[in-house]
């Protein structure tokens, strides 16, 4: 991608939106977008700010998670182990990258305008140590690309920072080729240089699948790192065994003993690293005035420049002697989840004895390869490389053993690692003014990083970092020269191995190196000793920054985490919190090892927040000169060539802001031993306000002015149209899939609910059927049960009264049973007496469910007890005894019976007594219902009482002093006892009788005190003929027995299906016709045989003819009739039966067609005659009417008069009739009337005359108006013929033919009339042939009267047809005569004059003329009426007669006269 912006100090920074897509040979195209801004501070130090921009749907990661962005795992709160494992999985797709992607770092470093591709000058204070740049002239020629190197040759000139032009892939390949050619000659110089790789603060969620490619010269051969193979053993099986995969992360459970990074030089390493080393050296030489940043080590001030150079020279020589290649040394930098406050310091200690100091052994967590620093080192032993090659052929791992480490650490100090010159130069030039940039850009960042550069000992002293901070320390072993003292604090440390494969770490760390955004080193102001937290630590989410990129960060919650690679604010950038990446004196690359990664727990990290709180993402620092197994040589050369000119330092993390350009610095060998420490400080986020309050005084830049927060970044579109459409399609597809899923779920749930509903419904229906069956059985049993009320009182008082029972129903008459009474006496049970009021409580006349005899109560203490003999259900119907009829129905006004209690416990029931009517004998009424007695124990023989047949026991006497309440309906004080049954036996009629609703009186024989009544002595006679009585008074209806359900089901099953032979639609049509006929087939047959259209009209006959059975249908029906039985014929559907019966009429189709044609012919010939007659009448009217000629002559006169003096139009003898419709458009001068109005008025005034006979004859029988008109017009009587004006009278006639006739005549076409006549003639002949066929084929009994009627019709039809033909010919001749008579010519484009043209002209003119003629006739009538009235008034005025008015009320004669007149009129 081409750089398209220029960073100017006088303008706001220009933000650029970049999109980087990656070529993955085995996957889909992925990419990411970021916005970057390159700005300068007042010292011309450039730094870059980047924000990730999310476009379209999430990019599918390599872990087969379709909805997860490749970098999204950084934003999730996952343990570091899982993050690094995910990094390991991503390496499988990072083998082949496009060169164009790797060259995309130039975007951030190129300025626009007419600056000739040069970077702006960098104002850097460099040290004056001449020992640093002894071979600066030799380094200058090795800078691959950049105008910076050309500028570095002038050491007396202040180094400026300028952009370089982008280089095409061809140029890069050529440069790599050149470097390869001269790399062998200059390897000595390059081995003495330091190389630095900018690592990226990269989150897994934000980064796409990228990888860094290294130069071929940096590939490390033969087991350079011991931990790579060990880590490779724990790799997932699905990861390809690529060089990168072999260097992938292994198990986090490994101890830190695997951190030994030793190995021999690779024999196939490319010598092109010399050029890279020269670049690093040139970078140093161009920044001599940079003051060094002292290290926390005690030996920070004891390294001399000459010693470092000599050590570097010896290292280079030893490398050339071994294999002319340079190995690598890697320093673990750091890794952290986006929200994890972890601080790490990679610290390399120089031990004189080659010992390496390490931290605690507890920290063995995964570290990305970008967190390791690769330093070209000196000689290494190669005996461990064979071991690696045996395990993994073709893959060069970095392994080492303890003896190798010992030998390597004792290497002379001259073997100093080379450093990328351009990156060092950029690092030295990045002296930022934090306050200026933070306010100018509107960002509040809590990331600061200050880089220190090599300097002389006398120029600067280094302070220890603040002890208040916690950090991670990675001790880097190095070989110290003889003059350089070793730090005392590191001499006693153990030597564990590197926990991860460094090559894999590097390969997995910077997938966005092609983006080339600046890395921000994390300052480490903390104490170098802090406890390590748990290995799988969780990281807190950080609040979003109120900056320009906040909108972008807000798109995902994880983007709100502050990152240390942003713009450093004025308060956060302090010298105390620095990131130092220093080389070791004479340390071989393999002896330089990352000892330990210390993780600080969240509590410890949060407690250590000070003024320099820093939040750092995983900064994977990868020097361009990495020599790991997982990097191809060619790709690495491209990477080196790209990282060299990256003065702005690309931040490789989309969505985070970059700080100073380089993550850490590799100082030269000549520096103090304190510069061999790498501090990476990771602190939680701290708001800018806190740092503003705690940061000591920092000067703010006057220019450029600070950038307000409201200033919007001017960028282009963040997405392309194709991406937008792709996102829309993706969302639509997701929406559609979601809708389909919801619909499927809904249908499934509906199906389940319907199934459950059907199941519940079936169960309920089954329960209903069971209840119905139970109810039916119980109803059948209720007919044989009754209620039995038994008194259970023990006192047997003598009875002092008798009961008189009144029988109200034949069926309810109770017969006393002696057997029951005997059985009751034998059982010594005396029932209590019941109130007689309960005898009135009985069901309706037809109800037989409950029957209970009631018992009169003698006192308020007695109560009624009734029981049922069978076991009682919830609503038990008791069984009555065979000889006891049911009680009478309830009288009106009484409530229902109390429910019967169950059998075993005899429950007392106290019914409320009714109000007592006034009895003839004084009986004291009861005050209320008495309390019921306690229930007696169940009786063993109670169940046998109703059917025992024994007489009931005598009722006990009531207590003295109390009388029972009188029963309702009794006119005397007699009461009946339920224990005493009626005297008369029950009568059982042979059939149910109508009830006689009387009030029954029953007399008790044992009652002694009652007075004798009629009923005692009255004897009931015997009915002699009961059959007659039953016949007369029996019930009309009887209950029908219900049929069993089995029979009903059997009948339903036996119903046979109706047979259909026709198509469904056809059968429906015939069925509709049958339902609309309302006729029987006999009527239809008779109407057809007799040709009678009064019964079957023509429309019905036509419908029958159209819906008659076709041949195939008729064949099916006839075949079915022939092959089926009579029972099956009844099952045939009605449409089929109807068509079959219709087909039974002989020659139905021919007969129907003849009858239909007879009606059609009559209508057709009548229509033709009417049309011909209209044309003939219109033509003759125009030819023979004198008034038509008068009107045309009048128009001719007016036209010639109007055209007088005009030689072309005047003096006309005639005119074309086309002018007639246009006369109404000729207006008068005042527009009050037109020419047609004037013609009509003139005609009515002077032309409307007619001859009449004598005026008297003309005036006879006229009304007063005619008389007035006659008198006014003709005052003198004249006899004989005379001419007079009739205008305005009823005698006035319209002078033209009727306009409607002209309109109808215009619709006639002679061609159509001729066609209709010919059609009728053909149909007539065809119908005649059908008649002959009918007469030939039909039986003789069906010929008459069809034959006679049809023959007569055809004779008449032929005559009428001939007459209409002659009439049509006459009409045509008359029309042609009319056209010629008026001189009309055909229309333009037509050959003949058509009736429509001629008659439409006359129709329009006649319509206008008739409208005006009616109006003017009315006006003339009004004028003549006025004249007649004036004449009459004049005559009456001359003959005045005085008349006396008579008062009708005063004169008796007048009243009589009026009365007579009224009577006569009536």
From Swiss-Prot:
Residue ranges that the Swiss-Prot or TrEMBL entry lists as coiled coil: 722-786
Misc. comment: Was originally thought to play a role in limb bud development based on the fact that limb deformity (ld) mutants are associated with Fmn1 gene disruption. However, PubMed:15198975 shows that limb deformity mutations rather affects Grem1 cis-regulatory regions localized in Fmn1 gene and that loss of Grem1 (gremlin-1) expression is the cause of limb malformations.
Stretch list, region Microtubule-binding: 1-624
Domain FH2, first and last residues per copy: 983-1435
Stated role: Plays a role in the formation of adherens junction and the polymerization of linear actin cables.
Regions of compositional bias (Basic and acidic residues) in chain numbering: 165-174, 299-310, 380-390
Localization in the cell: Nucleus; Cytoplasm; Cell junction, Adherens junction; Cell membrane
Protein name per UniProt: Formin-1
Posttranslational mods: Phosphorylated on serine and possibly threonine residues.
UniProt keyword annotation of Cell membrane present: yes
Spans annotated as Mediates interaction with alpha-catenin: 458-842
Gene Ontology terms describing biological process: actin nucleation; dendrite morphogenesis; forelimb morphogenesis; gene expression; hindlimb morphogenesis; kidney development; limb development; positive regulation of actin filament polymerization
InterPro entries assigned: FH2_Formin, FH2_Formin_sf, Formin_Cappuccino_subfam
UniProt record similarity statement: Belongs to the formin homology family. Cappuccino subfamily.
Residue ranges constituting the FH1 domain according to the UniProt record: 870-970
Any one Pfam family match given in the protein's UniProt record, by short name: FH2
Keyword vocabulary terms for this entry: Actin-binding, Cell junction, Cell membrane, Coiled coil, Cytoplasm, Cytoskeleton, Membrane, Nucleus, Phosphoprotein
Membrane topology: Peripheral membrane protein
Assembly and binders: Interacts with alpha-catenin and may interact with tubulin.
Region (Disordered): 150-192, 224-329, 377-413, 507-534, 559-598, 681-713, 840-897, 913-989, 1446-1466
Skewed-composition ranges (Low complexity): 970-979
């Amino acid at each position: 991608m081409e750089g398209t912006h220029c960073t100017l100090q006088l303008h706001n920074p220009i933000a650029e939106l970049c999109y980087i897509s990656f070529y993955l040979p085995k996957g889909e195209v992925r990419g990411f977008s970021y916005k970057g801004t390159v700005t300068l501070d007042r010292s011309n130090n450039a730094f870059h700010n980047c924000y990730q921009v999310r476009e379209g749907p999430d990019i599918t990661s390599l872990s087969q998670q379709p909805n997860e962005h490749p970098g999204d795992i950084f934003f999730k709160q996952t343990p570091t182990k899982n993050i690094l494992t995910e990094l390991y999985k991503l390496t499988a797709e990072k083998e082949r990258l496009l060169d164009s992607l790797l060259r995309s770092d130039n975007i951030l470093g190129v300025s626009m305008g007419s600056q000739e591709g040069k970077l702006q000058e960098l104002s850097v204070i460099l040290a004056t140590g001449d020992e640093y740049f002894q071979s600066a002239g030799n380094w200058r020629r090795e800078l691959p690309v950049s105008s910076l190197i050309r500028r570095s040759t002038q050491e007396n000139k202040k180094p400026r920072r300028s952009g370089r032009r982008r280089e095409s892939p061809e140029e890069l390949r050529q440069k790599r080729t050149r470097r390869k050619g001269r790399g062998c000659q200059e390897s000595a110089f390059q081995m003495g240089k330091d190389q630095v790789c900018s690592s990226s603060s990269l989150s897994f969620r934000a980064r796409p699948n990228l990888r860094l490619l290294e130069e071929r010269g940096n590939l490390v051969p033969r087991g350079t790192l011991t931990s790579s193979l060990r880590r490779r053993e724990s790799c997932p099986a699905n990861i390809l065994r690529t060089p990168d995969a072999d260097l992938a992360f292994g198990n986090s459970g490994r101890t830190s003993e695997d951190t030994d990074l030793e190995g021999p030089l690779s024999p196939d390493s490319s010598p092109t690293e010399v050029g890279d080393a020269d670049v690093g050296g040139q970078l140093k030489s161009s920044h001599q005035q940079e003051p060094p940043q002292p290290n926390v080590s005690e030996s920070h001030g004891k390294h001399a420049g000459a010693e470092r150079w000599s050590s570097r020279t010896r290292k280079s020589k030893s490398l050339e002697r071994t294999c002319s290649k340079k190995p690598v040394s890697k320093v673990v930098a750091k890794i952290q989840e986006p929200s994890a406050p972890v601080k790490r310091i990679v610290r390399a200690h120089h031990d004189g004895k080659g010992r390496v100091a390490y931290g605690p052994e507890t920290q063995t967590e995964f570290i990305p390869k970008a967190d390791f620093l690769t330093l070209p080192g000196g000689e290494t032993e190669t005996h461990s490389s064979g071991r690696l090659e045996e395990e993994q052929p073709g893959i060069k791992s970095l392994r080492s053993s303890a003896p190798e480490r010992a030998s390597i650490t004792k290497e002379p100090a001259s073997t100093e690692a080379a450093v990328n010159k351009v990156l060092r130069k950029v690092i030295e030039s990045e002296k930022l003014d934090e306050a200026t940039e933070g306010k100018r850009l509107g960002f509040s960042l809590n990331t600061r990083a200050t880089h220190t550069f090599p300097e002389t000992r006398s120029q600067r002293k280094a302070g220890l970092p603040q002890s208040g901070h916690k950090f991670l320390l990675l001790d880097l072993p190095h070989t110290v020269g003889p003059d350089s003292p070793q730090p005392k604090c590191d001499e006693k440390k153990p030597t564990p191995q590197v926990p991860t494969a460094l090559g894999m770490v590097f390969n997995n760390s910077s997938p966005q190196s092609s983006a080339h955004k600046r890395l921000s080193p994390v300052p480490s102001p903390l104490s170098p000793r802090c406890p390590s937290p748990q290995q799988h630590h969780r990281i807190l989410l950080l609040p979003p920054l109120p900056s320009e990129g906040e909108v972008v960060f807000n798109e995902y919650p994880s983007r709100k985490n502050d990152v240390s690679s942003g713009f450093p604010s004025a308060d956060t950038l302090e010298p105390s919190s620095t990131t130092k990446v220093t080389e070791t004196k004479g340390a071989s690359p393999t002896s330089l090892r990352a000892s330990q990664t210390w993780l600080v727990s969240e509590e410890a990290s949060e407690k250590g927040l000070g003024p320099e709180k820093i939040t750092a993402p995983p900064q994977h620092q990868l020097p361009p000169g990495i020599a790991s197994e997982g990097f191809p040589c060619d790709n690495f050369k491209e990477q080196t060539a790209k990282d060299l000119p990256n003065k702005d330092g690309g931040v490789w993390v989309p969505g985070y802001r970059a700080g100073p350009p380089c993550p850490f610095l590799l100082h030269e060998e000549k520096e103090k031993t304190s510069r061999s420490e790498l501090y990476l400080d990771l602190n939680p986020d701290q708001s800018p306000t806190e740092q503003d309050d705690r940061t000591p005084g920092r000067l703010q830049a006057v220019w450029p002015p600070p950038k307000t927060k409201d200033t919007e970044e001017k960028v282009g579109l963040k997405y392309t149209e194709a991406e937008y459409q792709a996102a829309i399609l993706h969302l639509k597809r997701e929406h559609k899939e979601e809708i389909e899923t919801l619909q499927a779920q809904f249908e499934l749930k509906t199906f389940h609910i319907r199934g459950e509903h059907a199941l519940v419904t079936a169960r309920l229906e089954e329960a209903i059927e069971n209840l119905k069956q139970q109810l039916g059985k119980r109803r059948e049993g209720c007919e044989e049960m009754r209620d039995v009320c038994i008194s259970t009182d023990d006192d047997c008082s003598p009875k002092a009264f008798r009961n008189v029972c009144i029988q109200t129903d034949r069926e309810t008459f109770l017969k006393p049973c002696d057997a029951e009474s005997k059985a009751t006496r034998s059982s010594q049970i005396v029932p209590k007496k019941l109130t007689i009021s309960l005898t009135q409580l009985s069901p309706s006349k037809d109800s037989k469910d409950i029957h209970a005899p009631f018992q009169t109560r003698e006192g308020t203490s007695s109560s009624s007890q009734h029981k049922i003999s069978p076991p009682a259900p919830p609503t038990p119907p008791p069984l009555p005894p065979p000889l006891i009829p049911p009680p009478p129905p309830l009288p009106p006004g009484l409530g229902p019976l109390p429910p019967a209690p169950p059998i075993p416990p005899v429950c007392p029931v106290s019914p409320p007594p009714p109000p007592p009517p006034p009895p003839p004998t004084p009986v004291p009424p009861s005050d209320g219902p008495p309390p019921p007695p306690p229930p007696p124990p169940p009786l063993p023989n109670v169940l046998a009482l109703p059917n025992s047949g024994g007489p009931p026991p005598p009722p006990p006497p009531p207590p003295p002093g109390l009388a029972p309440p009188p029963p309702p309906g009794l006119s005397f004080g007699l009461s009946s006892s339920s224990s005493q049954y009626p005297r008369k036996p029950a009568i059982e009629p042979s059939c149910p009788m109508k009830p006689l609703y009387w009030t029954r009186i029953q007399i008790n024989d044992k009652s002694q005190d009652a007075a004798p009544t009629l009923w005692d002595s009255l004897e009931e006679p015997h009915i002699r003929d009961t059959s007659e009585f039953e016949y007369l008074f029996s019930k009309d209806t009887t209950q029908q027995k219900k049929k069993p359900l089995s029979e009903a089901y059997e009948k339903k099953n036996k119903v046979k299906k109706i047979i259909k032979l026709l198509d469904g639609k056809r059968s429906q049509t015939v069925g509709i016709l049958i339902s609309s006929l309302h006729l029987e087939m006999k009527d239809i047959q008779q109407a057809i045989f007799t040709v009678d259209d009064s019964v079957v009209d023509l429309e019905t006959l036509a419908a029958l003819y159209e819906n008659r059975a076709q041949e195939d249908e008729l064949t099916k029906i006839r075949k079915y009739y022939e092959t089926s039985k009579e029972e099956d014929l009844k099952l045939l559907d009605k449409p089929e039966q109807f068509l079959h019966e219709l087909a039974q009429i002989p020659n139905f189709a021919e007969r129907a067609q003849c009858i239909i044609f007879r009606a059609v012919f009559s209508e057709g010939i009548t229509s033709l005659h009417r049309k011909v007659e209209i044309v003939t009448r219109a033509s003759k009217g125009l030819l023979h009417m004198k008034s038509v000629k008068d009107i045309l002559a009048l128009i001719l006169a007016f036209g010639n008069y109007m055209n007088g003096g005009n030689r072309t139009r005047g003096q006309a003898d005639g005119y074309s009739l086309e002018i007639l419709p246009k006369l109404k458009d000729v207006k008068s001068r005042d527009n009050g009337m037109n020419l047609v109005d004037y013609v009509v008025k003139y005609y009515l005034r002077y032309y409307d005359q007619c001859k009449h006979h004598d005026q008297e004859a003309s005036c006879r029988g006229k009304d007063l108006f005619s008389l007035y008109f006659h008198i006014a017009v003709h005052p003198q009587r004249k006899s004989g013929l005379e001419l007079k004006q009739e205008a305005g009278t009823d005698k006035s006639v319209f002078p033209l033919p009727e306009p409607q006739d002209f309109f109808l005549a215009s619709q006639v076409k002679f061609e159509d009339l001729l066609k209709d006549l010919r059609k009728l003639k053909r149909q007539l002949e065809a119908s005649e042939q059908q008649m002959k066929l009918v007469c030939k084929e039909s039986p003789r009994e069906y010929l008459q009267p069809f034959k006679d009627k049809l023959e007569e019709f055809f004779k008449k039809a032929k005559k009428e047809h001939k007459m209409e033909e002659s009439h049509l010919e006459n009409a045509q001749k008359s029309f042609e005569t009319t056209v010629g008579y008026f001189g009309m010519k055909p229309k333009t484009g037509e050959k003949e004059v058509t009736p429509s043209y001629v008659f439409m002209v006359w129709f329009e003119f006649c319509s206008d003329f008739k409208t005006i003629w009616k109006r003017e006739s009315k006006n003339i009538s009004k004028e003549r009426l006025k004249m007649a009235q004036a004449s009459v008034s004049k005559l009456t005025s001359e003959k005045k007669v005085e008349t006396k008015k008579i008062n009708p009320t005063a004169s008796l004669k007048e009243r009589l006269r009026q009365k007579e007149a009224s009577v006569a009129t009536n």
